Amino acid sequence: MEMMMTAAPRIAFLASTAEPAQRARQELMARYGDCSIEEADVLCALGGDGFMLRTLHRHGASGKPVYGMKLGSVGFLMNQYHDDLLERLQRAEPAKLRPLQMMAQTESGVSVESLAYNEVSLLRQTHQAAYISIDLNGQTRIDELTGDGVIVATPAGSTAYNYSAHGPILPLGSHTLALTPIAPYRPRRWRGAILKADTEIRLRVLDPYKRPVSVTADSHEIRDVVEVTIRESTEQRVTLLFDPEHNLEERIFSEQFAF
């Protein structure tokens, strides 16, 4: 389905600090003009996937669709950089994403909330393995996971850290989440689970003083956590725009056949 957009949409250009992205931003503003985020019809993010995630975290609540152009090292969430921007915006296909909503409790009693568009990951902070229990919708499913940690990934993020940890690639729009252990020692044969998107996931660190654990929501890290609750956000949703010949759904599908 193509995105309905005015013939000359107002574009706010955002760029990473990398020199190629900054240079491209100046060239695009000279050609198409520039406006504030508040006045824009669409945001154009110039950089790599890391910058796209930062853009979504900073401006996702604006409700403006985001069209990314790859000027970084990794560009799974980006389109290729070309000159015919207006034509491509007219033909762009939307992908609507809901982030994960995370609540973390630390040893000191502090509560920290964050969103994650790719994944939430718990990881041991020292050489010692983490001990983590896993509750789903209030029911304990794993009393004690021993290993490096555990990942909860969205479909859009399932091809990233989750896939590197041998987790499943999830189809876009499948309304599922991937729950994937990182280097599990016990239970040794458990390779994770595919969950309904509305599942509430509670991860408890069983020996936080001797075996400390950190949690990272995309790039936001909180150290020394004792409990983390994760669920799909019911309030926030973002729209990414992709060229129809290489949309996000096709990219996720193609990753399953990459060698």
Curated annotation (Swiss-Prot):
Family (UniProt): Belongs to the NAD kinase family.
Top EC class of this enzyme: transferase
EC number per UniProt: 2.7.1.23
Name recorded for this polypeptide: NAD kinase
Any one GO BP annotation for this protein: NADP biosynthetic process
Predominant place of localization: cytoplasm
GO cellular component: cytoplasm
Binding sites annotated in the UniProt record for NAD(+): D49, G50, R54, N118, E119, D148, A156, T159, A160, Y161, N162, Y163, S164, A183
Reaction catalyzed: NAD(+) + ATP = ADP + NADP(+) + H(+)
Cofactor requirements of the protein: a divalent metal cation
Protein's job: Involved in the regulation of the intracellular balance of NAD and NADP, and is a key enzyme in the biosynthesis of NADP. Catalyzes specifically the phosphorylation on 2'-hydroxyl of the adenosine moiety of NAD to yield NADP.
MF terms (GO), sorted A to Z: ATP binding; metal ion binding; NAD binding; NAD+ kinase activity
Active site: D49 (proton acceptor)
Keywords: ATP-binding, Cytoplasm, Kinase, NAD, NADP, Nucleotide-binding, Transferase
UniProt cross-references to HAMAP family, sorted A to Z: NAD_kinase
NCBIfam families linked to this entry: PRK04761.1 (NF003406)
Subcellular location: Cytoplasm
Keyword Glycoprotein listed: no
Originating species: Xylella fastidiosa (strain Temecula1 / ATCC 700964)
Gene3D superfamilies according to UniProt: Probable inorganic polyphosphate/atp-NAD kinase, domain 1, Probable inorganic polyphosphate/atp-NAD kinase, domain 2
InterPro entries the UniProt entry points to: ATP-NAD_kinase_N (IPR017438), ATP-NAD_kinase_PpnK-typ_C (IPR017437), NAD/diacylglycerol_kinase_sf (IPR016064), NADK (IPR002504)
